[in-house]
Curated annotation (Swiss-Prot):
It comes from the Eukaryota. A zinc finger (C2H2-type) spans 1-5, 11-33, 39-63, 297-319, 325-327. This is Protein hunchback. Gap class segmentation protein that controls development of head structures. PANTHER family: ZINC FINGER PROTEIN, ZINC FINGER PROTEIN PEGASUS. InterPro entries: Ikaros_C2H2-ZF, Znf_C2H2_sf, Znf_C2H2_type. GO terms for cellular component: nucleus. SMART domains: ZnF_C2H2. Residues 205-216, 265-276 have a biased composition (Basic and acidic residues). The lineage of its organism: Eukaryota, Metazoa, Ecdysozoa, Arthropoda, Hexapoda.
Amino acid sequence: HMRNHLGSKPFQCSQCSYSCVNKSMLNSHLKSHSNVYQYRCADCNYATKYCHSLKLHLRKYQHNPAMVLNLDGTPNPLPIIDVYGTRRGPKQKPFSKMFEPQGPVSNNNQPQPPAPTHPIFGNHFPVNLPYLPPLLPHSFLFPPNNNYEQRTSPKNHEIQTEKPQQMSPPASILHQRLSYTERPLESGSTSPPPKSPPSITQTPTHREMPTEHGDDALDLTNAKTSEAGTPPPPTERATPVTPTTALKNRRKGRAFKLQPAALRLQHEDEKMRDADGSDSESDASAEVASSSAASSYTCQFCDITFGDLTMHTIHMGFHGYNDPFMC
């Protein structure tokens, strides 16, 4: 390109006054001084001095190229005419491919090393043909390899033996969860499950968790009849089961998260009862009931006091169990 700007034409023809800027133009010009037609058609008498002209002829008539000739007229088997390629000029066949024997000359007793040739097509294709359509199964395209099966079969057995072991820990965790949820029901007195619509069917785990919620909700209201750490029996429930509370208990299945707050309120109630030992038992129980009713609807995380149990329970449901301030 710079030679065109500078007007320099260093390539001169030895037979005439022609000069050009590159070697390829000079080679094309030298063909005009020769009578040898290097590129010929194998299906007809067409012959030309230029490779591009032969490609156009082969594309137009669907013919095949003949062997390329040298500048002196001798045949040259190395160049390959790529009819539909975009590269200008003939392709050069590598010397190693020309001098390789076509027939199988290796000894049968010696194992052949793995070569990147296809097992069916042999040396005709130097690659494994990734574009081959998957019309045949894998066993028909490739010969069986016992070493590969022996290497992969122990791993398959190990995977099959490890699967039951991997499945067993979730089963044990499930049994622990079921035993944990069934333990309060066995220890306490028998009571009917909370009311729920007959159309809704739930699993045993989800059916038992509202009862735990009912026991823990009792810790907030009936603190005068329960000791620290032991939930009162369900028969002494103070708040009646209304459709609103039944729906709320079914929706909120993790009410046992409020147990630390209930224990803290129970300890405060015990301290107040110890301080008022001179009063009668009826007066002490009334004061404890009134104080617990005033403080049982308070969120210990947000310092918010609610007017009734419904709003307090809905609010406490938004606090996480591990992290109360994480939604």
